[in-house]
Amino acid sequence: MQLVIAEKTSVARNIAKVLHATNVKDGYLEGKEYLVSWCIGHLIELASADQYRDDWKAWKYETLPMIPENWKYQIKESTKGQFRVLKELLHRADITEVICATDAGREGELIFRLVYNQAECKLPFKRLWISSMEEKAILEGFQQLKDGHEYDDLYYSAVARSEADWLVGINATRLFTVLYHHRLIVGRVQTPTLAMLVEREKSIENFQKEKYYLVHLLMDGLDAVSSRIKEKSAAVQMMEDMKDETAQILSVKKEKKKVQPPKLYDLTTLQREANRLLGFTAQQTLDYTQSLYEKKLVTYPRTDSQYLTDDMEENALLVVGAVNSMFPEMSIKGSEPDIKRLLNSKKVSDHHAIIPTVEITNMDLKALPGGEKEILMLIASKLLCASEQEYIYESIKTEISCHGELFTASGKNVLQYGWKEVEERFFKSYGKNAEKPEEEESDFPDIKIGQVFECVVVKFSEHFTAPPKHYTEDTLLSAMEHAGSSDMIEDAERKGLGTPATRAAIIEKLIEKGFIERKKKQILPTADGRNLIRILPEMIKSPKLTAEWENDLTLISRGQKNVEEFLFEIEKMVTKLVSDNGQPVEEYQKLFSDGRKEIGKCPRCDNKVYVGKRNYYCSGSDCSFTLWKNNRFFESQGKTLDEATVRKLLSEKQVHFKDLVSEKTKRKYEATIKMEVSETGNPKFQLIFPERKKGKKNEE
C-alpha cells in the first residue's frame, strides 16, 4: 500500500479519484492500492523565540541577536488533528512507500518534508511532479515518479528561506520595537518592498512640475507640433506668426515594423495584466487561478516561465483548438497557430507557462464564478495571441516647415493586424471593464516631400511635465520582479523581491499590518509605513541585498550554493544590525509618540490594549495578544468586533447577545460568547447557551 500526501483537500480528492481511492475515512481516502491524505498547507512551523530560551521570552535589547544553535519546529495549533492523522498513516504497518504530491515547488517541498521529518518517518518516498490536475497528467505523473531525494536541494533552499526569514524578521522586529517602544514589524522581503513604495512617494512629492506649451499645425488630417515652448507669450506669438501662412513637407520617413506576439503568462505577468485590465489584486488573481487549476481548467499557476516544453507541441495545438471552440468571439477563422514559437525547454525550470487545458470543453463556463471566468478568458486570449501572426505596421514620421519653424508629426498605417486582432476581440468582449492600452492613431494621411498646405489652422496647447506615477499592483509587481537586477551579474538565476508565488502575499501582509493601503488602483504607503522606512538602516531595506539573497536561494535549489554559507551571511548581517543600532535616534522617537486610543487591559499581561486600524492589540513588547476586527468567529455569528464588544470582553471575558445569527439556518438566537486566552496570547471563543426553562409556575 502506498500513501499519497497532497497539499490541499481539493487536490487530494482529484488525485484520489484518478487512483480509485474513493472510500472516505477520517482525514484521508482509501483504495485498494493507495491511501490519499492532505496537509492543509503548512502543518509544521519554526518554533517561536520563546521556545528556545527562557530569556528570549522578554523583548530586550540584551537578548539580541537571537540565533538558534539548533532549529526547532512545532505543530501548528490549528492543524494538530490532521498532523495526527498523517503521523498514524506514515507509521501504518501496511504502508510501504510514501508519495509526495504537494505543490511542485519550493514551499510544497517544505510542507511535505517537515511533516515527514516531524513524524519521524523512515519509509522511502517518491515525488509526483505535475503541472496540471487533468486525469491524463496525473496518470502520466504516477508513471514517471522520481526518487524523493532528487529534490533535496529544493528542500534545502526552502529551509534556508524560512530560517533566513526567521532570523531577519524576529531580530529586526524586536530590535526596532524595543528601541522605539512601538510595535514595528520588519521582514526580509516586505521591508524592501515597502521601501520602494516610500521612495516613489518621495519622488512624487519632491517633483517640481513645469509648464510648457506646444503650437499645433492642423492640415488635412495631420496634427504637427512644435518643440516645447516655456513661455506662453512666445507660443502665442508663434501662433500669430503662422496664421494664413503656408506649410511645406520637408521629409517623410517610412519604416516597416513588426511586433512579435506576446509571450504566454507566468504568474507575475498574469497578475499584472489582470490588475491593469480587470482591476483584480495580485492575491485575487492567484486565488482565482489556483481554483481554476484545481478544477483542471488551467495548468499550474505558480510558475516563472513564459514558455512550454518542446514535447508539448501536440498538446498545445489541441488546447488552441479547444480555446477556439469555447471562445469563438476571440478566435480568428482560418488562422494557422504557430505553436513552435511557444516552445523552449531551456527556459522552463520547474513549470511551464500558464495555459488552459482541454478540460475546458467539458465545463459549463457559465457556471464559473465571475472572477474565475474572466481570468480563464484572459489566459485563453493570451494563448491565442501568442500563437498568432506578427502585428505589422508602417511607421511614418514627417518634418514640416512653416514660417521658418520646424514641426513634426508621426503615426502609422496597419499592414497586418495578426495577434492584435485577438487582443481587440478580447477588449470588445469586456467593453468598459477592460482598460485598452492607448495606441497611436492609424490611417496616417498620404503625404509627399515638397507638398504644400495653404492657410494652415494654428492653435496652441498648455501642458505640464508629469511626476512619476504612484505604484499600482501592476507596476509594483514589475518593480518587485526586477528589483536589484541592474546591480547583479548578467547570468543571475533570479532577480527581484520574493517569487511569483509569494509576491501577492507580501503585498497583502503590508496592507494587513497597516504599512500600505489601496486607494482605487493605487498602492500608497501609510504614515506608519513612511516612519518605519525612515528609521531603518539601508542594509535592512535594500532591494538589492534582498534580491541577491533570492538569487542565492535559487542557487541552493540548483545545488550550486551551500546552505550553511548562505545562513552564515544572514547571521553576520543580523549581528551587525544589532551592534550598529544600540540606541534610538532621538529625532525619530517623536515619530512614534503615543497618540493611540486605549480600550482596556490585556487579559494575558495586563498592559494597555489599543485600537488599531484593523485590530485591537496589546502594547506589551513581549505579548502577542490581538483581536482582529474582522474576526471569523464573530462574523460567523452575524457580529463584528466593535469597540463596545471588545471593552466587555477585556473587562469581563465574556459578552452576552440576544441577536446572534446562525450561520446555517440564518435564524436569530441568544447566547454568551466567552473568551479564553492561551499562554501564547491566542484568543479562543466558545458559545454558552442560556439554560432552558423547564416550565412556568402559575402565579396567583
Predicted regions and their residues:
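Intrinsically disordered, low-complexity regulatory segments
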Residues: M1-S162, W166, K432, P467
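Basic, low-complexity terminal or inter-domain segments flanking catalytic cores
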Residues: Q2-L3, K25, T79, L90, ...
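C-terminal or mid-to-C-terminal helical accessory/interaction module adjacent to the motor/catalytic core
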Residues: A93, A137-M219, K254-K258
